[in-house]
Design a protein with these regions (language model features):
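C-terminal beta-strand-rich structural cap/linker in extracellular carbohydrate-active enzymes
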Residues: 653-678
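Bacterial N-terminal signal peptides
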Residues: 29-40
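N-terminal accessory beta-strand-rich subdomains and adjacent acidic, glycine-rich linkers
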Residues: 49-319, 637, 647-650
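Aromatic- and carboxylate-enriched substrate-binding clefts and catalytic-loop regions
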Residues: 371-546
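Catalytic cores of secreted or luminal carbohydrate-active enzymes
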Residues: 548, 552-592
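Edge strands and adjacent loops of beta-rich recognition modules
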Residues: 131-134, 584-605
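Carbohydrate-binding surface patches
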Residues: 598-634, 667-673
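An acidic-aromatic substrate-binding cleft motif
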Residues: 295-365, 369
Length: 678
């Protein structure tokens, strides 16, 4: 059984005395030990091989057993949501004679001991759905010894909104610590037999433009247990959302650092078991290893399961909670809104006159930034200097676009070959920082291999030193990096509005309504999402979404810099009430509430900044939808932007009590904001 001396608090609170830490009950030859929400079941004649750790409320639990390899199971008060699933690693190393040694850490493990503690964390984010966070959970660390002498620890945590675990390999043996290890395979899998539906997104086959987490998700849901069809992708992307009775499970990872690669779900799903796997060999044009190489001590990323009702899924910050805390000064980091010329005119980034129009638009709308996209380096030096001066006069910060390559891609858009070499990168950052540039957009990453993950992190570190905000495009997915590096304000990794301008089958316009209603439950749960929303221009003739739908995306989508991507004339033509809404939209939120919705069909979110609330509702379906809402937490008159009486743009002022029932037309939406800000 556990010794209470191994238990501790991490929030600075007083360590409880052993008598209060553990209550032991002897019953029919078993000791039952309750310790910080952990139930340890052990025989009086043998070492324990069964453990349970609970959230503080007891509503969420992880069972662990080790009688036939390490396995875990996750349950809520409604029942099992993830059935018994395998854990384990296989590592290898080379000695000085280049002899290969394999360490199987998936079976034949001998239990050594364990520790429990309450983990509490209080932190403030610069961007996101909830800036101030104070979170407590219970942790159980199980320590094992492998048959070949290498130790393995597995840390399990249970919070109110989910559970997580990670592998830890460390040793006091100097010789072993000096070796270079390779992660041969990870046995982590998730038995989702209890689930009834899954909402997967294919993981791209690697090519000159992918992977980029931009494949269309199956927004209508899919049967649990289906392998990835070859024509759709090379596996399933994370995050992955499952419906399990009254509960939901969103699987993801957090705390990814340079010691590992980015994971996704393997294409073969057997008996409803979804297995983690690593990058594809031909990612980054074949450069770099597909496995992870590291020295000890080593910690894997956290394997995260956000669990509960849809409100818990959408409102969760568990991915950020599990990420390493920030170590940089972030006082200078400012979230904001930006104009963006490229979507409406792909060549505009080479035209200083067009770029000036978008700087002026940002100033008129009260936005903070304007993005100058690919090939801006072709602008003559004098004209570029004039653009910088004009933006400074208007108090608009500029973002500049860069190619991440390097040998990792063959995309010719420029500037390129500046981000992959650290010396060149830092020199460029120093140069543009001196020019007053506020941020960078770095595009076309195309790989989750370890060397590319390290490049992301090195770039964030260098950018922070020169006080540059960062936007990653054509990139991997968020994994809590915006907590560790607060200058990371947004990431793409979504099939966003730029796809309106691309030829594809089916066209993005057909997919957009349901995709828009899905990503608030999946992609945008895990971190900021640069979908570049809110398009009104009629020239995008394939757009099915209404004006109200597009307007509501400004609330429904969370991004530390929200890029409004329509042409200048489209925004200037809006009625004053609509302009006031776009001018007022916050870019970082104090609170987010899920009010109603179902993945791929519809969603209603309320977000608070200070004492004021904004509400966004969208319908992803071709049928109208009537909604009953409780806005009793909102006070004061609200302006409602909607699609009423056949008018593309309509507005009215209502009291919150009058908004208990709203109607969304097919593919429609409603945006609601405080009247006092007009």
């Amino acid at each position: 059984v556990l010794d209470s001396e191994n238990s501790e608090r991490t929030d600075g609170g007083e360590l409880l005395k052993p008598d209060y830490l553990a209550a032991r009950v002897h019953y029919q030859g078993l000791f039952l030990v309750f310790l910080f929400g952990v139930l340890i079941v052990s025989s009086s004649q043998a070492e324990p091989n069964d453990w349970t750790i609970h959230s503080a409320s007891g509503e969420l639990s992880i069972d662990i057993r080790s009688d036939a390899g390490i396995q875990f199971r996750v349950s809520t008060v409604s029942g099992v949501v993830v059935d018994w699933s395998p854990l384990g690693l296989v590592l290898s190393s080379q000695d000085s004679d280049l002899n290969e040694h394999t360490y199987d850490l998936s079976g034949g493990l001998e239990y050594v001991d364990s520790q429990t503690r309450e983990v509490c964390d209080q932190y403030r984010l610069k961007i996101g759905k909830r800036l101030d966070n104070h979170v407590c959970g219970n942790e159980l660390v199980l320590n094992f010894q492998s048959q070949n002498g290498l130790p393995l620890s597995v840390a399990f945590r249970a919070y109110e909104d989910g559970v997580a675990f990670r592998y830890i390999v460390e040793t006091d043996t100097d010789f072993v610590s000096s070796l270079s290890f390779r992660l041969v395979s990870e046995q982590t899998a998730f038995d989702m037999s209890p689930a009834t539906k899954v909402f997967p997104q294919p993981y791209d086959h690697a090519d000159s433009w992918r992977p980029s987490y931009e494949a269309p998700a199956l927004s209508a849901g899919d049967a649990v247990g289906r392998s990835t069809p070859q024509e759709l992708g090379a596996g399933w992307s994370m995050p992955m959302l499952f419906e399990v009775g009254k509960d939901w499970v969103l699987i993801h990872e957090s705390g990814l650092v340079g010691q590992s690669y980015g994971s996704h779900i393997a294409p073969e799903v057997v008996d409803n078991v979804y297995r983690l796997t690593g990058p594809l060999a031909d990612e980054a044009l074949g450069h770099g290893n597909t496995d992870a190489h590291f020295a000890l001590p080593w910690k894997s990323p956290w394997r995260v399961m956000i669990v509960g009702a849809l409100s818990k899924i959408v409102q969760s910050n568990l991915v950020q909670t599990l990420a390493p805390p920030a170590t940089i000064d972030s006082e200078w980091v400012q979230s904001g809104r930006a104009s963006w010329s490229w979507l409406s005119d792909h060549d505009s980034s080479q035209d200083p006159a067009r770029l000036t129009e978008f700087v002026d638009l940002a100033a008129e709308m009260g936005w903070e930034y304007s993005l100058v996209d690919a090939n801006w380096n072709r602008i003559p030096t004098e004209a570029f200097s004039q653009l910088l001066s004009h933006a400074a006069q208007k108090n608009i910060g500029l973002f500049l676009w860069y190619n991440s390559g390097g040998k990792n891609n063959a995309v010719t858009e420029a500037p390129r070959n500046l981000m992959s070499d650290r010396g060149l990168r830092r020199a460029e950052f120093e140069r543009i920082s001196a020019l007053g540039i506020r941020g960078i957009k770095v595009d076309f990453w195309h790989s989750d291999k370890q060397f590319m993950i390290q490049r992301y992190l090195d770039l964030l570190e260098d950018a922070a030193e020169f006080k540059l905000l960062v936007n990653f495009h054509g990139s991997t997915i968020p994994r809590g990096w915006e907590r560790t590096w607060p200058n990371l304000v947004t990431m793409e990794a979504v099939r966003g509005h730029e796809f309106y301008t691309f030829e594809s089958q089916p066209h993005y316009g057909e997919l957009a309504p349901s995709q828009n209603a899905l990503v608030p439950f999946t992609r945008n749960v895990i971190g900021p999402m640069d979908s570049t929303p809110v398009i009104f221009a009629p020239k995008l003739i394939s757009r099915l979404t209404t004006y109200g739908h597009e307007a509501a995306l400004g609330v429904v989508y969370e991004s530390g810099v929200q890029h409004f991507s329509d042409e200048v004339a489209a925004y200037r033509a809006l009625p004053d009430e609509w302009k006031a809404y776009l001018s007022s939209l916050p870019s970082a939120w104090d609170e987010t509430r899920f009010l109603a919705g179902y993945p791929g069909k519809y969603v209603v979110l309320a977000r608070r900044k200070g004492d004021l609330w904004w509400v966004g509702a969208i319908n992803g379906s071709p049928e109208p939808r009537n909604l009953t809402l409780d806005l009793s937490f909102v006070s004061g008159a609200m302006t409602v932007l909607s699609d009423e009486d056949g008018q593309p743009v309509s507005s009215r002022v209502e009291q919150p009590s009058s908004l208990s029932s709203i109607e969304l037309p097919p593919y429609g939406g409603v945006a609601i904001y405080p009247t006092t800000i007009q």
